Structures are given as structure tokens and as C-alpha cells.
Regions:
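Juxtamembrane intracellular "pre-TM" segments in multi-pass secondary transporters
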Residues: 1-27
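Extracytoplasmic gate region of multi-pass secondary transporters
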Residues: 17-79, 132, 136, 167
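Small/hydrophobic positions within alpha-helical transmembrane segments
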Residues: 33, 66, 70, 123, ...
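Helix-to-loop junctions at the C-terminal end of transmembrane segments
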Residues: 74-87, 175
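C-terminal transmembrane helical hairpin of 12-TM major facilitator-type secondary transporters
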Residues: 88-138
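A late C-terminal transmembrane helix in Major Facilitator Superfamily
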Residues: 143-178
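A membrane-interface helix-boundary motif in multi-pass transporters
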Residues: 171-191
Length: 211
């Protein structure tokens, strides 16, 4: 009987370990994706505006200033919505969804209006800042019962830096080879992947929180 109980306990621990692994893997990948978009948009949007609409550098620089300011407002909105919408990954999925709509709208209106492009880019960038806030600040405490919260927070923040590094080199290379129009489509696809990834593990995440 004792041996049977130990086997059941061991099997339960293994299943929990596997569950934690998949949850963590999905969350880390989603954070990398938001890092690519968040820093990619803020870094390359001024260049896109300048090259696409042949505008003065001062205007494109203004774009680089406007995006972070708008993102601050979106982060505050995210914190407000967090109190209304149950489930961290549900809200994160919605924020990614807003990013999908913004990125695709940016793609669909490419080369039509600088103002419209900036507004959609600001919404996309802001959405990713909201995602980052949720995933790097609200999620780590739930892993406290399994280890060090600060380690988990550091690990998830590291994933953001991976995304940032990937956007710095990867998006530049992609835009040079395939053009801005396809780069905007790529942003849409990245946001869609993040949205589907978060929503796909929402149920298992909600169960994990109460175990």
C-alpha cells in the first residue's frame, strides 16, 4: 500500500512538473513575441514613417517619442482591465488580439496616411506594453509556491530581452529583403501567434493557479 501511494504521488508530481514546463514554455515564447513587437515597433516605426512618406526626420523622431507616451496610457488601461477581467492569460490574449487588429490595420492602410499609421502603430506598441506588464509582473507570483519569485520574474524579463534582440537584427534584415509592407504583415502574424498561444493555455493556467 505504501509503495502504491508513493507511485501515485510520484506520478502526480511528474504530471505537475510536465504541466509547469508547458505553461512556462508557452508563457516564455509569448513574452519573446511581445518583445519582438514592442521594441520592433518603437525602434523601426520612425524609419518606416520617414522612408514610406518621405517626411522630415524631425517628424519621424516625434513618432518615436509619441509611441512610449501612448504606451504609458495603455499600461494604465491594462491595470484597470485586470481588475475587471478574471485570468491573466485571458487579458493577455485580448491585448495580443488588439495588437493583431492594429498590426493588420497598419498593413492594410500601408502608404496611405502617416497619421493613421502612427495611430495604429501606437496602439500596437501600447498593446505589447500591456502584455509585458501582465506577463512579467502579474504572473511570477503564482510560481512562488514552487520556488523563488524573483528568479521567475528575472527569467521572464530575460525573454523580453531575447525578443528585443531578435527585433533589432531580425526585423532590419527582414525589411531590407522583403520590404516594409511584408514587415507589417509579419507583425500581424507575430501578434496572432501570441494571441493564440495565450488563449490556448488559459484553461490549464487557471487550473494551475488553484492547485
Amino acid at each position: 500500500s505504501g509503495s502504491h501511494d508513493e507511485m501515485v504521488k510520484s506520478n502526480g508530481s511528474f504530471k505537475l512538473t510536465v504541466k509547469i514546463f508547458w505553461i512556462l514554455a508557452a508563457i516564455m515564447l509569448a513574452i519573446v513575441l511581445q518583445g519582438i513587437l514592442r521594441d520592433g515597433v518603437s525602434t523601426w516605426m520612425p524609419s518606416y514613417i520617414a522612408e514610406t512618406f518621405k517626411l522630415d526626420n524631425k517628424i519621424s523622431i516625434f513618432t518615436g517619442v509619441f509611441l512610449p507616451l501612448f504606451s504609458i496610457a495603455v499600461v494604465q488601461l491594462t491595470i484597470f482591465l485586470y481588475k475587471k477581467i478574471p485570468g491573466e492569460l485571458t487579458l493577455t490574449g485580448f491585448m495580443f488580439g488588439a495588437g493583431v487588429i492594429s498590426a493588420f490595420a497598419l498593413y492594410a492602410t500601408d502608404n496611405t496616411s502617416a497619421v493613421i499609421s502612427v495611430l495604429f502603430a501606437a496602439t500596437l506598441s501600447g498593446s505589447m506594453h500591456g502584455v509585458n506588464t501582465m506577463m512579467t509582473c502579474m504572473i511570477p507570483p503564482y510560481f512562488g509556491k514552487y520556488g523563488n519569485i524573483s528568479f521567475m520574474a528575472g527569467l521572464l524579463n530575460f525573454c523580453t530581452y531575447i525578443g528585443s534582440a531578435a527585433s533589432g537584427f531580425g526585423l532590419a534584415l527582414f525589411s531590407e529583403n522583403f520590404g516594409w509592407h511584408n514587415t507589417l504583415l509579419l507583425w500581424s502574424m507575430i501578434a496572432l501567434c501570441g494571441c493564440l498561444l495565450c488563449l490556448s493555455i488559459t484553461r490549464i493556467w487557471n487550473k494551475f493557479k488553484i492547485e
